[in-house]
Amino acid sequence: MLQPKRTKFRKQFKGRIRGEAKGGSDLNFGTYGLKALQPERITARQIEAARRAMTRHMKRQGRVWIRIFPDLPVTSKPVEVRMGKGKGSVDFWACKVKPGRIMFEIDGVSEPVAREALRLAAMKLPIKTRTVVREDW
């Protein structure tokens, strides 16, 4: 699963996801892409599940680009522990995704295969998405 090799700080604030994506809202690598329509935290496990669903449907043909990276450490305290006594340990890694962000890109397969692969990937994610196609080719 994806996670940073090293970080400047071990833990981060929760924060909020406001506004729309400034960058990363256009297709850069592939012909087909999966665009987020809602703000949400996407975990490394969800990214990996979506990637596996796509590559399995594409039968390892074509190419997949993952345009998001889980760089946000999410902490949790153990079960049945009283409040206080500091912040919990890092439980998993996540990525803040804003509306308009391209999360995955595909190239090298036919349009029906690409659309179905992206649909299967979208089912693994907790947000509404849209399949986008590069128009300038």
UniProtKB/Swiss-Prot annotation:
GO terms for cellular component: cytosolic large ribosomal subunit. It comes from Dinoroseobacter shibae (strain DSM 16493 / NCIMB 14021 / DFL 12). Gene3D superfamilies: Ribosomal protein L10e/L16. SUPFAM superfamilies: Ribosomal protein L16p/L10e. GO terms for biological process: translation. GO terms for molecular function: rRNA binding; structural constituent of ribosome; tRNA binding. NCBIfam families: rplP_bact. InterPro entries: Ribosomal_uL16, Ribosomal_uL16_bact-type, Ribosomal_uL16_CS, Ribosomal_uL16_dom, Ribosomal_uL16_sf. The keyword RNA-binding applies. Coiled coil: none annotated. This is Large ribosomal subunit protein uL16. Belongs to the universal ribosomal protein uL16 family. Binds 23S rRNA and is also seen to make contacts with the A and possibly P site tRNAs. Keywords: Ribonucleoprotein, Ribosomal protein, RNA-binding, rRNA-binding, tRNA-binding. PROSITE patterns: RIBOSOMAL_L16_1, RIBOSOMAL_L16_2. CDD domains: Ribosomal_L16_L10e. Part of the 50S ribosomal subunit.
